[in-house]
Amino acid sequence: MMQDLRLILIIVGAIAIIALLVHGFWTSRKERSSMFRDRPLKRMKSKRDDDSYDEDVEDDEGVGEVRVHRVNHAPANAQEHEAARPSPQHQYQPPYASAQPRQPVQQPPEAQVPPQHAPRPAQPVQQPVYQPQPEQPLQQPVSPQVAPAPQPVHSAPQPAQQAFQPAEPVAAPQPEPVAEPAPVMDKPKRKEAVIIMNVAAHHGSELNGELLLNSIQQAGFIFGDMNIYHRHLSPDGSGPALFSLANMVKPGTFDPEMKDFTTPGVTIFMQVPSYGDELQNFKLMLQSAQHIADEVGGVVLDDQRRMMTPQKLREYQDIIREVKDANA
């Protein structure tokens, strides 16, 4: 907002200065044209004066005026007689005297003066007489008009320069050093995991309960805690549980009397770490899943219920090794 106000002040000050200069030139030309209109009448009356009086008239006309004198061939007695007469020149002096102070400061003689004297080819032209003394009073009427104008001009550019100070050329940005990549932190090793397999019927079918019960018992599972089947260290059910088998359908429990029972599949899971060698327990778990799938006519799936692949089996083994290393 302040910069907008400063720009407005600068523009207003410049317009004021231009208006003053145009007005001064216009006034000067107007006064000069009026002086040239009055001068022929004065010259007609000054022809009767002698050469000495003509020089006095030149002093009254101001700086840089060109005077044209006609050679006077009259007798000397006639000149003396004319010199005794009162000079009519003083009757026309006030108009010139009043017009001189209104001339502009340091106005050089323009080229318009010689064409006005051109119609008199037979008259000799004298050199212009420069009188510096009248210059001092000529500056007085002009100074009060020009002096107040520069005040807003000198005060306004100072904040304008300050406004453009931020526009200084900015040094080219130095290339930033490339940060070295931070060392990749090793993923923290897991200390426990759950290995999951599924035995499911083919698409659109279900596993028969009686057939499923026989295959589960043949694989060494025993019905126990949480109403699900567990595979213990010993086939007779003694020792710690190595892995367990649950129903794929929530809540995941079984009924031991499931002759009329059907299900889309069962889930076998093993918690790692576990008792004994986890890799050996995993092999036993995979063998049990394949035995049940073969007996009921199903397929073995991974934890995402996709077809089990050798890559997925290696992934399970890597997880088991990672947990073992973390708990070593």
Curated annotation (Swiss-Prot):
Coiled coil: none annotated. Keywords: Cell cycle, Cell division, Cell inner membrane, Cell membrane, Membrane, Transmembrane, Transmembrane helix. Its main location: membrane. Pfam families: ZipA_C (PF04354). Residues 42-186 are annotated as: Disordered. Residues 99-115, 123-171 have a biased composition (Low complexity). SMART domains: ZipA_C. It is a single-pass type I membrane protein. GO terms for biological process: division septum assembly; FtsZ-dependent cytokinesis. Belongs to the ZipA family. NCBIfam families: septum_zipA (TIGR02205). This is Cell division protein ZipA. It comes from Shigella boydii serotype 4 (strain Sb227).
